[in-house]
Amino acid sequence: LPESWQVHYKDLTFQVKPMNFKHTGLFPEQAVNWDFAMDKIRHAGRPVRVLNLFAYTGGATVACARAGASVCHVDAAKGMVAWGKENARLSGLGEAPIRWIVDDCAKFVEREIRRGKTYDAIIMDPPSYGRGPGGEVWKLEDNLYPFVELCSRVLSDKPLFVVLNSYTTGLAPSVLGYILQLLVGRKFGGTVTWDELGL
């Protein structure tokens, strides 16, 4: 098995390499979300600013940038952000309008709110459990609701979409849908849908 290799999806290219915990740096089941985001961005009829939180190696970041969006990619792991930059470069998007941020996602969103920054779309893929760069503890069951509420405050007046992914076995997709409906749907309108992804 090679140390790393490239995978192509449509006009996107990703570097894949086996890591601990059976990760490869790519979640191919997310392609349905990449397609959704690219379609929304391409048909928005306006410039789109996307905030990608817990952005990992940047699959969604690269897809949104390919569709023409300005993207802010945030992950607490420096190595994942570097990998995301490499995926953008491999996809011919090395000079695309992407901000690469190594930070705790909640703290970053709080600062963006104070700065008056807004985004037309948010993609988030929070872990079940994790630690931020400053040792901050994240537990999805405890932190998701207040985190989505916080994120709703950085959305523009006419948001295009919000995508929330979770691999936490204890939370049904309907629970995530309910949280989005309560905190985003009621505030901005639109349609909230949920489903399970698989290969």
Locations of regions flagged by a protein language model:
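Non-catalytic substrate-recognition/targeting regions of SAM-dependent transferases
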Residues: 1-28, 35
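Conserved alpha-helix/loop element of class I SAM-dependent methyltransferases that forms part
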Residues: 28-46
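Conserved class I S-adenosyl-L-methionine
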Residues: 45-56
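Conserved SAM-binding loop
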Residues: 52-53, 73, 101
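Conserved SAM-binding loop of SAM-dependent methyltransferases across substrates and taxa
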Residues: 57-71
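S-adenosyl-L-methionine
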Residues: 77-123
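Mobile active-site "lid"/loop adjacent to the S-adenosyl-L-methionine
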Residues: 78-80, 102-105, 119-150
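C-terminal catalytic and target-recognition region of SAM-dependent MTase-like enzymes
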Residues: 158-199
